[in-house]
Amino acid sequence: MTTSTPLEPTARTTVNRGRNRSVADRDQLHAFLADALVAHIGVVVAEDGQSHPVVLPAAFAIDLDGPDPDGTLYVHGSVAAGWLRAAQDATVCVTVTELDGLVAGRSAFHHSMNYRSAVVIGPARVVDDPGERQHALDLVVDHMIPGRSATLRASTRKELAATAVLAVPLREASMKARAGGPVDEPEDVDAGVWGGHIPLHRVAGEPVTGEDANGPAPADVVRRAASL
């Protein structure tokens, strides 16, 4: 298994604001990425002779033993997506955020949010190797529901031909996190206005069996719903 190295800030990933919220432990980054569900990828695309940035949500997964030093982040996409073609061999930015609470300060200035957030910057690579691509797609499925890929039929050639995977090295990354209540000015505290925070939690409902499904939800789905 890959031995993780500390997060080493680069000119592109150095945290300049809220440095006290910066996370230096790469293992914490890995744990956060394993928990989060949605990534946003930013890339510059060209249309009608003009370039502009786009940021799009995507399913993702990480492989700490992947082909890149410090692991690989895989982003799920479609071969028909223009942003994915534009990302090939380009530098992209992938962000992942989980909102953990709303912070009510005693002034508008000190209202905030509790969160965990990661930024990964690096050269993107469209995965062409069939073995790596299938492995990455299995990881994406298992990131949603652990163990699910082993219960599914093999993907058809048509399905694989329509599906693309983008690989981004995990080496150049940063993470920030905030927790707890507001940090208010003493005079605002003395004024008597309420301050505090509202914790937010991700909660899953009971699995809903499809009308054409046979039997109840399988164990992997039930376990996943219970763990969210």
Label each region the model flagged.
Residues 1-12, 128, 132-228:
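C-terminal edge-of-domain segments
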Residues 73-76, 94-96, 118-120, 166-167, ...:
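Short hydrophobic-aromatic micro-motifs
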Residues 30-32, 84-86, 157-160, 166:
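A general structural signal for short secondary-structure junctions and capping/turn motifs
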Residues 43-44, 49, 83, 105-110, ...:
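Catalytic micro-motifs at enzyme active sites that drive phosphoryl/nucleotidyl and oxygen chemistry
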Residues 37, 56, 69-71, 88-92, ...:
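A generic structural signal for short beta-strands and their flanking turns/coil linkers
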Residues 79-139:
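Short, structured beta-strand-loop surface elements
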Residues 60, 122-124, 166, 170:
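A structural signal for short, well-ordered beta-strand segments
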Residues 6-75:
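An N-terminal domain-cap segment
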